[in-house]
């Protein structure tokens, strides 16, 4: 076979991964076995008529524009390889969900618009989160073992606590009942679209009701200027519910 066909000899040959004339028994399909000296552009056209090579896939609309952005040992995915990657050296052996556009798949080492990772590549057990894969993540070490609701980061996706908290969770209007034990005091930068879920860990006690009372517990509640007006606990003891103005509550 002529070297112009870009066939690549397999490891069964004497000199592995060479672009040379080699026998049929050790010839790999064109553009399917990357070598450091090759530009990884999947356009198998010269292999069609060769008995030593088989085309990796049928020509497609996106094939001509597919160029790998990965390093040499990285697993690649394209429209001619529809099976998604299960692990990739580029992603530290993580299971990598991919966002596939109809007809043409996006390479896993690129970062398309709808593919948002929740953790860095340095974490060996990280998982990736994407708005195209709505049930991808269950827990991630980068989020301190918190369950991360899958909701595209927008005006309605506002974290309530910092990543340093081991019991933190994320809260958003897309997942209104997300938090179980998280601070419910939104700051001025929090969107009003985000309805906080109040729990006792961050609530403000009412002095007249005792230290154990909390604004998030229905027995004794208080609304403060720092607490969102959207968060309104139900009070079972009306006399104990005082507004900022000092008036009694009607609840």
Curated annotation (Swiss-Prot):
<feature type="repeat" description="4">
    <location>
        <begin position="84"/>
        <end position="88"/>
    </location>
</feature>
<feature type="region of interest" description="15 X 5 AA repeats of C-C-X(3)">
    <location>
        <begin position="26"/>
        <end position="224"/>
    </location>
</feature>
<feature type="repeat" description="12">
    <location>
        <begin position="178"/>
        <end position="182"/>
    </location>
</feature>
<comment type="subunit">
    <text>Interacts with hair keratins.</text>
</comment>
<feature type="repeat" description="10">
    <location>
        <begin position="146"/>
        <end position="150"/>
    </location>
</feature>
<comment type="function">
    <text>In the hair cortex, hair keratin intermediate filaments are embedded in an interfilamentous matrix, consisting of hair keratin-associated proteins (KRTAP), which are essential for the formation of a rigid and resistant hair shaft through their extensive disulfide bond cross-linking with abundant cysteine residues of hair keratins. The matrix proteins include the high-sulfur and high-glycine-tyrosine keratins.</text>
</comment>
<feature type="repeat" description="7">
    <location>
        <begin position="104"/>
        <end position="109"/>
    </location>
</feature>
<feature type="repeat" description="2">
    <location>
        <begin position="31"/>
        <end position="35"/>
    </location>
</feature>
<dbReference type="GO" id="GO:0045095">
    <property type="term" value="C:keratin filament"/>
</dbReference>
<feature type="repeat" description="8">
    <location>
        <begin position="126"/>
        <end position="130"/>
    </location>
</feature>
<comment type="similarity">
    <text>Belongs to the KRTAP type 10 family.</text>
</comment>
<feature type="repeat" description="14">
    <location>
        <begin position="202"/>
        <end position="206"/>
    </location>
</feature>
<feature type="repeat" description="11">
    <location>
        <begin position="168"/>
        <end position="172"/>
    </location>
</feature>
<dbReference type="GO" id="GO:0005829">
    <property type="term" value="C:cytosol"/>
</dbReference>
<feature type="repeat" description="15">
    <location>
        <begin position="220"/>
        <end position="224"/>
    </location>
</feature>
<keyword id="KW-0416">Keratin</keyword>
<protein>
    <recommendedName>
        <fullName>Keratin-associated protein 10-10</fullName>
    </recommendedName>
</protein>
<feature type="repeat" description="5">
    <location>
        <begin position="94"/>
        <end position="98"/>
    </location>
</feature>
<feature type="repeat" description="1">
    <location>
        <begin position="26"/>
        <end position="30"/>
    </location>
</feature>
<dbReference type="InterPro" id="IPR002494">
    <property type="entry name" value="KAP"/>
</dbReference>
<dbReference type="Pfam" id="PF13885">
    <property type="entry name" value="Keratin_B2_2"/>
</dbReference>
<feature type="repeat" description="9">
    <location>
        <begin position="136"/>
        <end position="140"/>
    </location>
</feature>
<feature type="repeat" description="3">
    <location>
        <begin position="52"/>
        <end position="56"/>
    </location>
</feature>
<feature type="repeat" description="6">
    <location>
        <begin position="99"/>
        <end position="103"/>
    </location>
</feature>
<feature type="repeat" description="13">
    <location>
        <begin position="183"/>
        <end position="187"/>
    </location>
</feature>
<keyword id="KW-0677">Repeat</keyword>
